[in-house]
A protein has these predicted regions:
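An N-terminal assembly and electron-transfer interface module characteristic of large anaerobic redox
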Residues: 1-247
């Protein structure tokens, strides 16, 4: 039987002068937006999760998918309901077979079925970001900025970020890390692990509520997770190897 093959073409880097929508990821989003703006992109944040957005995403699934998938899909579909102009959406992928590494391909299939040809997915391969990123150093600072803010007490974060540039430099990050490390802490130390979306947007406010009660929530650092991923996939013959060693 003849089987039609539908190629899935996913761009690795965004085009300039076309809106680029980033997933809502708490403190990380503003710094990732600043990074992409420095690279000539036009970044915006996707809508935050609501019941309506989740319903949009779940209407396109036939199984009990983990929450990040219908949340991402629903936020993209919600944005497309408001604006059908040419736009780009950042959905990273991975080389492995795990479900969250395949979101971009499935979302692309849904958009194609809905005739959303003006919606382009930007899907960089996480394992090869040190080779593909337009500015590795700036990208890592964007990730680290979010990690450092989340390491600070919740009531100190606004003051810390107000002292930074849109994308903080190394000196600003070092200073903030030293100051946060010297702060006296109170409450229990609670480790929180999970996907970046689950630790920022999809926790139903549980982590923020714990912090409001005086507990110290230690979120798994995104920069550290990606650094280990890059280190595991390191090619010593690539120029990016020296940058990873420096990090």
């Amino acid at each position: 039987e003849q089987v039609d093959i539908h190629p899935c073409r996913l761009a690795q880097t965004p085009s300039p002068n076309v809106p680029l929508y980033l997933p809502a990821m708490g403190a990380y989003t503003a710094y990732l937006a600043a990074y992409f703006k420095q690279q000539g992109a036009d970044p915006y944040e996707l809508p935050h999760l609501t019941d309506d957005i989740l319903s949009l995403g779940r209407a396109e699934t036939s199984a009990k998918e983990y929450l990040p998938f219908p949340a991402l899909l629903g936020s993209i579909l919600a944005e497309r309901k408001n604006d059908h102009a040419h736009a780009q959406f950042l959905i990273p992928q991975t080389q492995g077979a795990e479900a969250d590494g395949q979101y971009a391909r499935v979302i692309r299939a849904v958009l194609d079925r809905r005739k959303e040809q003006n919606a382009q997915l930007i899907s960089p391969m996480l394992e090869t970001l040190p080779e593909m990123a337009q500015n590795c150093d700036a990208l890592f600072r964007a990730l680290l900025a979010g990690d450092i803010l989340y390491a600070a007490p919740a009531d100190k974060r606004a003051d810390i970020s107000a002292q930074w540039d849109a994308l903080p430099g190394w000196e600003q990050l070092h200073t903030a890390a030293r100051e946060i490390g010297a702060l006296l802490t109170k409450g229990r130390r609670i480790a929180a692990v999970g996907t970046p979306l689950c630790l920022t947007e999809l926790d139903s406010g549980v982590l923020a509520a714990l912090e409001a009660e005086g507990e110290q929530v230690l979120r798994a650092p995104l920069s550290e997770a990606l650094w280990f991923l890059w280190k595991d996939n390191l090619d010593e013959n690539k120029p990016s190897a020296g940058w990873l060693d420096q990090m």
